Amino acid sequence: MHEQQLSDAEPPKPRTGVNLRGLAQVTIGVGALALVVMKADTRGLVNALEHTRVSYLPVAIVASFAVTWLMAYRWGTILAAKGVRFKTSRLFPYYLIGVFFTSFVPGGGVSGDIARLIYVDREVRDKALVLSTLVYERLIGVFTLLLIGLIATLMTRAYGQADPRIYVSEAVLAIAFAAILILMSGYVSARLARMIRFIGQRIRAVKVAEAAARTLEAVTELRRDWALLMKTAAISVVIRIVWSLGCFVVASAMGLPLDLLTVFAFISLIDLVRLMPISVGGLGVREWAVVVLFATVGINREQALTFSLLAFAPIYLNAIAGGVAYVFRARISA
C-alpha cells in the first residue's frame, strides 16, 4: 500500500436532504436524555459530581482510547486474513473517524462502518471484501459482548442479586446470544445467500443482491478460519475487559457499591442497548438503561445519570479526535 494513496482518499460525504429516520433518532435521543435529566434532582447531580474523585477519570479516558486501538488491531487482523495488510497505526485514525460518525451522525454503528468502508476501499478496491471484514468484526464483537455479559450476569445472580430485572437481563442476553450463533452458522449463511440472490432476481436488483450474497459468503469463509476466530475472539475478550475496567474505575471514583462482575454484566447490557439504532450513538436510551439497571442494586437516579455521563464521555473524546482526523484528511485531499 502507498502512503500517497491514503492521503488522497476522499472522506465520506454526508447525504443531503431530510432523513426522516435520522431525524427520529435525534428526536428520540435528545428527548430521552432531556426526560431523564428533568426527572433527576439537580442538587443530587451536583452532589454526585462533587463526591467524584476526578483524579481517577484519566484512567477511563486512556482505557477508551486503548479500546479503539484494540478494535483497529482486531480489524487489521481480519483484513490480513483476506490478504490485505494495514498497520494498526494506519487503521486507528479510520476507527476514530468511525466513532465520530457513530456518535454524531444518525444511523448508529452503520454510519461509522460506512465511513471505515469508504476509506479502506480507496486502497483495496473491493467493497464486498472490506464489507465482509466489517460484518465479521461486528459478529465476533457482539458474540463476545453477549458471552461475557451472560456469564457475568449468571455469576452476579449466584452472588445473591435476584432482582426480577436480572432474570429479564439473562433472558435478553441468552436470546441475543442464540441469534448470533445462528447468524454465524455456515448452514444459515449459505441459504441466506441463495435467498438474497433469488429475491434480487425477482425484484430486478441483481447487482445489489449479488454484492450482499458475496459479502455473506466471504464472512462464511472467514468463519472457517479457526485460527482467526480464536485470535479475534481473544482480542474481543481483551476489549471487553479493558472497556469494563474503565467503567469500573468511574464507579470507584464515584464510590458506587458496584463489584467488578456487576459492572461487566451491566455494561454488556448497556452496550447492547447502544448497538440498537434507536438514537444517535445510544444517547438518552443509554442513560435510561443505566438508571434502570443501577436501581436494581440501590443506586439512585442522580448517581446513575452521573455515572453514565462520566463513563461514556471518553467515547465522545474519541469521536472529537475522529472529527479532527476527518477534517485533517479532508484538507489534505482538497
Summary of predicted features, one role per range:
Residues 90, 94-100, 195-216:
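Juxtamembrane inter-helical linkers in multi-pass membrane proteins
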Residues 208-253, 260:
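Alpha-helical transmembrane segments and their immediate interhelical loop/hinge regions
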Residues 23-24, 57-61, 88-93, 167-172, ...:
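Hydrophobic alpha-helical transmembrane segments
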Residues 15-18, 46-53, 84-87, 123-124, ...:
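Helix-boundary and loop/linker segments of multi-pass membrane transporters
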Residues 1-50, 101-205, 279, 283-334:
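Transmembrane helix-loop-helix hairpins in multi-pass inner-membrane proteins
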Residues 57-61, 65, 95-101, 131, ...:
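Hydrophobic faces of transmembrane alpha-helices in multi-pass small-molecule transporters and flippases
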Residues 32, 71-78, 116, 243-250, ...:
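Hydrophobic/aromatic residues in alpha-helical transmembrane segments
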Residues 72-97, 250-265:
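Membrane-embedded helical hairpins/re-entrant loop segments and their flanking transmembrane helices
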